[in-house]
């Protein structure tokens, strides 16, 4: 039984209404939980506002919400919504939002029974020093003010072990268009691999490129191809690396891709390969998993929660280990299909309806 109304933030810093949170909002709309959605005036990609308007979701737009300025003005607007809608629980997505809500709760409204849920999306996790500092600062804020903290993977929950019972494990969902009724056919010639990610430090596309070059030379592989969609400060450096290694014709750089374009790349491939130092969740892990692709990954994000090495995926800890994985799968391509089939059969754990059921259950427990 629902006990009150939820205020759900659907936008993030410098992004506006995000694609991910739009999917979550649409799933929440199908549940019995009553909510009010709030967002900044911008959107991550064109069409997100129309998607939710088409199904009758009204989002309160607060100008400047996703810019770190005008704190008092934003807090007053949020306080008005909480008061007018009799909100009993607020779900925030970043540190700026939780500070605004804490100010509303304790200073503007003095509504001490207002519950706060926080989703951990990131914490400078590709920089060791910044990661430690961020965990300490964020952790202190969450210990003091959050009632529950959603961690999207066991990997992330361990990073914030000191939150104790406040931390709950609920994964993210994946967009409905990734849930195909039948297992899409896997390419059967060579390793067709994809890693969608920003080109920045910590994503390590260079490790994949070098390992791929070594594999091609070692196995005389004339069939395989690597796709690296995304953009960022290191993209030109990665392109140069492929030329230096003589594999420029075997690696494609499609640039920024929409969700639908990334989906089409996955369907051209039989392997999702991940090289990140760290992921809080790892959509780049889950998307190929849901589509029934083999997943090759470092031990980050949700990978250890869903992959068993040598069965439905493969782990590696170094460039040389990645070369060995490439060689093994190239010479035993039946293993790619076996892993893909296992993953496709487990895909429903990431359907938004199933994730939302757990999420609404969390809210109900807060009101008991």
Report residues per predicted region.
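Conserved donor-binding/catalytic core segment of Leloir-type glycosyltransferases
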Residues: 7-9, 186-203, 209-212
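Short His-centered aromatic/hydrophobic patch
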Residues: 92-98, 120
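Carbohydrate-associated surface elements
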Residues: 155, 173
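Short alpha-helical donor nucleotide-sugar binding micro-motif in glycosyltransferases
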Residues: 256-257, 264-269
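Aromatic "clamp/platform" in nucleotide-sugar-dependent glycosyltransferases that forms part
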Residues: 277
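Short hydrophobic beta-strand element within catalytic cores of glycosyltransferases
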Residues: 294-297
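Conserved acidic donor-binding segment of nucleotide-sugar-dependent glycosyltransferases
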Residues: 309-310, 314-320, 328-333
């Amino acid at each position: 039984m629902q006990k009150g109304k939820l205020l759900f933030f659907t936008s993030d810093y410098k992004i506006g209404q995000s694609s991910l949170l739009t999917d979550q909002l649409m799933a929440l709309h199908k549940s019995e939980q009553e909510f009010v959605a709030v967002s900044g005036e911008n959107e991550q990609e064109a069409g997100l506002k129309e998607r939710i308007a088409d199904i009758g979701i009204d989002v309160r737009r607060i100008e400047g919400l996703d810019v770190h300025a005008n704190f008092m003005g934003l807090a007053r607007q949020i306080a008005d919504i909480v008061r007018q809608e009799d909100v009993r629980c607020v779900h925030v997505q970043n540190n700026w939002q939780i500070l605004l809500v804490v100010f509303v709760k304790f200073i503007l409204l003095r509504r001490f029974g207002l519950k706060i849920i926080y989703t951990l999306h990131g914490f400078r996790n590709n920089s060791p020093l910044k990661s430690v500092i961020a965990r300490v600062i964020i952790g202190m804020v969450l210990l003091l003010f959050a009632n529950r903290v959603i961690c999207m993977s066991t990997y992330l929950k361990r990073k914030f072990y000191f939150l104790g019972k406040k931390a709950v494990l609920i994964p993210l969902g994946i967009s409905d268009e990734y849930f195909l009724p039948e297992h899409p056919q896997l390419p059967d010639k060579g390793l067709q691999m994809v890693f969608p990610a920003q080109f920045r430090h910590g994503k390590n596309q260079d490790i994949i490129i070098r390992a791929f070059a070594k594999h091609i030379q070692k196995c005389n592989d004339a069939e395989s191809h690597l796709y690296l969609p995304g953009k960022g400060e290191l993209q030109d450096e990665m392109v140069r690396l492929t030329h230096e290694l003589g594999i420029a014709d075997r690696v494609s750089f499609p640039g920024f891709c929409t969700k639908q374009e990334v989906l089409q790349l996955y369907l051209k491939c039989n392997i999702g390969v991940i090289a990140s130092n760290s992921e809080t969740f790892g959509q780049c892990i889950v998307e190929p998993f849901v589509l029934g692709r083999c997943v090759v990954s470092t031990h980050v994000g949700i990978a250890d929660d869903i992959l068993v090495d040598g069965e439905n995926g493969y782990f590696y800890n170094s460039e040389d280990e990645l070369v060995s994985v490439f060689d093994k799968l190239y010479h035993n391509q039946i293993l790619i299909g076996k892993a893909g089939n296992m993953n496709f059969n487990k895909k429903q754990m990431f359907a938004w309806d199933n994730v939302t059921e757990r999420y609404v259950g969390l809210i109900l427990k807060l009101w008991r």
